[in-house]
A protein has these predicted regions:
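A short, aromatic-enriched beta-strand patch in the conserved N-lobe beta-sheet
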Residues: 90-92
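Activation segment signature within eukaryotic-like protein kinase domains
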Residues: 129-130
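AlphaC helix of the protein kinase catalytic domain
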Residues: 111-121
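Protein kinase catalytic-loop region centered on the HRD/HxD motif
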Residues: 135-145
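Conserved short submotifs of the Hanks-type protein kinase catalytic core
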Residues: 96-110
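AlphaC helix of the eukaryotic protein kinase fold
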Residues: 57-79
């Protein structure tokens, strides 16, 4: 930071003038809670991902946890370190009063885009992607958090689809009792666990269900249930057993198929209790296709 910007930052209470510090290189991608930019850090010349959170929507979300000392999205993201989790460089407040997060820029497709396009790049890479996603989610849980929005949209792949990284901790909360009370229904409806939809107490096993739905779609190019844009379709999650994954992907390794279906058990007690159990269950699987 230059000396002029340093003193200006002090006068602004440590807030950052985004326009002065970052050059926007690519138009914003608007999300539900934020805008995302490809930017150049004028101080370091580094190309970064710049996420600016919508002030009103962020305040409304955080109001649900008023008095609980919930860490911000930036604080959570910065505390996580894993090869399959996006790197967060810095975070703070803009001079306009908006939270911002600076992270590595991932110049690859979202997993959701590859699924929508039924990309051939996924062939032969699915098992590796499943393991990386599972390890990333395990790292989030081991750090003491629940992600609460595991879905293909929140995994960004490399251009060759051999690796991926977990992103977006906007709905993530500490895995503590006060943050897991019924009534806090958040996430992407198509991937919601039954206990979330039905407003029951939740824990990290809701992520395991959403992970299972995402992996199912990775192989089937279909969800285990009817797709819907709101919570009404999600009410059907867990009411009947998902079709066997082999109906859509006949070559799937049976051990992997059973592990995915166990993630999708309606009752949390019948799922894997942590991601380590899932990884252990598939440790001997060598290829996504049965030999």
């Amino acid at each position: 930071m230059g000396i002029t910007q340093f003193f200006k930052s002090i006068l602004d209470g440590g807030k950052v003038d985004i326009a002065a510090r970052y050059e926007i290189l690519r138009d914003a991608v608007s999300g539900t809670m934020s805008n995302f930019h490809m930017a150049r850090d004028r101080e370091t010349e580094q190309i970064v991902g710049l996420k600016i959170l919508d002030k009103a929507k962020t305040e409304a979300l955080e109001a649900r946890f008023r008095g609980l000392n919930k860490p911000t999205e930036g604080q959570i993201a910065a505390s996580l370190s894993h090869p399959s989790i996006v790197i967060t460089y810095s975070h703070g407040m803009t001079t306009a009063g908006e939270q911002f997060i600076v992270m590595e820029f991932l110049d690859g497709p979202g997993l959701n885009s590859l699924l929508i396009g039924r990309s051939e790049l996924l062939g032969g890479n699915r098992l590796a992607l499943v393991r990386q996603a599972a390890e990333a989610l395990a790292a989030v849980h081991e750090a003491g958090y629940i992600h609460r929005d595991i879905c293909p949209r929140n995994f960004v792949c490399s251009k060759d689809a051999k690796t991926l990284k977990l992103i977006d901790f906007g709905l993530t909360v500490p895995a503590e009792k006060e943050f897991m009370q019924p009534g806090i229904r958040t996430g992407t409806p198509n991937y919601m666990a039954p206990e979330v939809v039905r407003r029951r107490p939740t824990d990290k096993r809701l992520d395991i269900f959403s992970f299972g739905a995402s992996v199912y779609e990775l192989f089937a190019f279909e969800l285990p249930w009817q797709r819907g844009a709101d919570g009404r379709a999600a009410m059907a999650h867990g009411l009947k057993a998902p079709p066997p994954l082999s109906n859509y992907y006949p070559k799937v390794d049976p051990t992997l198929e059973q592990a995915v279906l166990k993630c999708l058990e309606p009752e949390p007690t019948n799922r894997f209790q942590d991601m380590g159990q899932f990884l252990k269950a598939i440790r001997r699987v060598r290829h996504e296709d049965a030999s």
